[in-house]
């Protein structure tokens, strides 16, 4: 199993490059480590949603939703667009979308096959 991973490794990196990448990945994983934030990003992979739509889709109350969206916004994973009185959120971080898709493949599609 570990040997399979070696076939997909990236070319050799310098220690400094590896450290920089490790910090980038750790920060992204830290941001996505909260269940509500992970559910939000999973939902936003599908497209742009208003706060009301996210609240309904995820089933989380407005205060918690706003707090977690704020964390995602501050980290640069999502951005907002205002349309009259509604605020819409969309994913801006491609790496977050790729990670969520990989997690979905690992954790969700295998359960369907079992």
Curated annotation (Swiss-Prot):
<feature type="domain" description="HTH arsR-type">
    <location>
        <begin position="17"/>
        <end position="111"/>
    </location>
</feature>
<feature type="DNA-binding region" description="H-T-H motif">
    <location>
        <begin position="51"/>
        <end position="74"/>
    </location>
</feature>
<keyword id="KW-0805">Transcription regulation</keyword>
<keyword id="KW-0678">Repressor</keyword>
<keyword id="KW-0238">DNA-binding</keyword>
<dbReference type="InterPro" id="IPR051011">
    <property type="entry name" value="Metal_resp_trans_reg"/>
</dbReference>
<dbReference type="InterPro" id="IPR036390">
    <property type="entry name" value="WH_DNA-bd_sf"/>
</dbReference>
<dbReference type="InterPro" id="IPR036388">
    <property type="entry name" value="WH-like_DNA-bd_sf"/>
</dbReference>
<protein>
    <recommendedName>
        <fullName>Biofilm growth-associated repressor</fullName>
    </recommendedName>
</protein>
<dbReference type="InterPro" id="IPR001845">
    <property type="entry name" value="HTH_ArsR_DNA-bd_dom"/>
</dbReference>
<dbReference type="Pfam" id="PF01022">
    <property type="entry name" value="HTH_5"/>
</dbReference>
<dbReference type="InterPro" id="IPR011991">
    <property type="entry name" value="ArsR-like_HTH"/>
</dbReference>
<comment type="function">
    <text>Represses an operon that probably comprises itself, PD_1892, PD_1893, PD_1894 and blh. Binds to a palindromic AT-rich sequence spanning the -10 region of the blh promoter and blocks transcription of the operon.</text>
</comment>
<dbReference type="GO" id="GO:0003700">
    <property type="term" value="F:DNA-binding transcription factor activity"/>
</dbReference>
<keyword id="KW-0804">Transcription</keyword>
<dbReference type="GO" id="GO:0003677">
    <property type="term" value="F:DNA binding"/>
</dbReference>
